[in-house]
Amino acid sequence: MLYGGAINLAGSVKGKRTAKHAVSDWMEIEKQRGISVTSSVLQFDYAGHRVNILDTPGHQDFSEDTYRTLMAADSAVMLIDAAKGVEPQTKKLFWVCHRRKLPIFTFVNKLDRYGRNPFDLMAELEQVLGIHAYPINWPIGIDGNYKGVYDRIKKQIELFEDDNSHGSKILKSTTGSLDDPQIIEALGQELYDNLCNDIELLDLAGDEFDMTRVNNGELTPLFFGSAMTNFGVRSFLEKFLELSPQPQPLSLIHISEPT
């Protein structure tokens, strides 16, 4: 929403006065507890697209509202904590999305903190949720000290300039090819070699990208970044808008809450 101009601070639910759709947790209990207890719709425009975000409660005590709201969704964005991985409530919400054959886009969040190995997180998605992942971008760095991402589709590196703004504005970035001498120098030889090894492993052993499988909920495009610092957010937003299907008529099906 920061990129669409609907809010002026990443991680904040307080929007500009002119952006009435930018307020999410508006109830007093939500402000006090710092969680959503009811669903809300957030709307913003970006690059000729109008995006409607269905912001649903993540806490299991309010899961019924979340299940109902998912019936109106055309795509789902599954947020994974880089340190915690797949959590119990995530599994329940995934089951509902998978049952509806919703395209699921996965964003591994909080790379500004210590987290697990990206390959381990990919393996957990397959083992716990039964869905294969295709990394659209790949993080460059280690343990909360990430420098940028490698776009596997564009075959391009994007390095971010950390200005200590803590999400108050869009991060500046520098882009270049994998063999760009300036990019290699900025990364350092060790990080560059690690990135090349990761890319080779993904290309040799990873899944092929298939939009049919994505639309059937069998393959999830995978992204890495930090929503709080805007690390990797722009590339996710633009690729999501490119790949996500247009709204379609909905068919009614009965879904019981998973146990």
Show the residue positions of the predicted features.
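P-loop NTPase switch module centered on the Walker A-proximal segment
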Residues: 1-80, 86, 135, 177-180
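P-loop NTPase catalytic nucleotide-binding module
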Residues: 83-252, 256
